[in-house]
């Protein structure tokens, strides 16, 4: 049985966000680096840096937290894995779903690389829907 690295990074980020951790360390692969670049560009995380430990590379992510000084802790974002190894979900560019009316993003794996739903619609290409973020 193979390992689902996308589900692993989504779970690590979600757990760290729920436990109010400032940083997360995830395994660095080409797919995870591309997803982290999208998260940085869209403003869901503050910082990402590459770290080497015993010939293994890790990405150390700094999460963006919004704290209301008078009220409770505000959860930053939600992540949901859509396509998984047992059930792949594909979509053409016309049927890519809009997340919260355009407030969230969908990350797609296309023939031109990993990109957001907006970029895929602009380029007119579809692909495998990896996850939703809102």
Swiss-Prot record:
Top-rank taxon of the source lineage equals: Eukaryota
GO annotation (BP), single: translation
Offer a single GO CC term for the protein. Answer: chloroplast
Cellular location(s): Plastid, Chloroplast
Q: What is any Pfam family matched here?
A: Ribosomal_S8
Q: Cross-referenced SUPFAM superfamilies, in alphabetical order? A: Ribosomal protein S8 (SSF56047)
Q: PANTHER family of this UniProt entry?
A: 40S RIBOSOMAL PROTEIN S15A (PTHR11758)
Quaternary context: Component of the chloroplast small ribosomal subunit (SSU). Mature 70S chloroplast ribosomes of higher plants consist of a small (30S) and a large (50S) subunit. The 30S small subunit contains 1 molecule of ribosomal RNA (16S rRNA) and 24 different proteins. The 50S large subunit contains 3 rRNA molecules (23S, 5S and 4.5S rRNA) and 33 different proteins.
Which HAMAP family does UniProt cross-reference here?
Answer: Ribosomal_uS8_B (MF_01302_B)
* Free-text function comment from the UniProt entry: Component of the chloroplast ribosome (chloro-ribosome), a dedicated translation machinery responsible for the synthesis of chloroplast genome-encoded proteins, including proteins of the transcription and translation machinery and components of the photosynthetic apparatus.
Tell me the protein family, please: Belongs to the universal ribosomal protein uS8 family.
Provide the protein name. Answer: Small ribosomal subunit protein uS8c
Provenance organism:
Spinacia oleracea
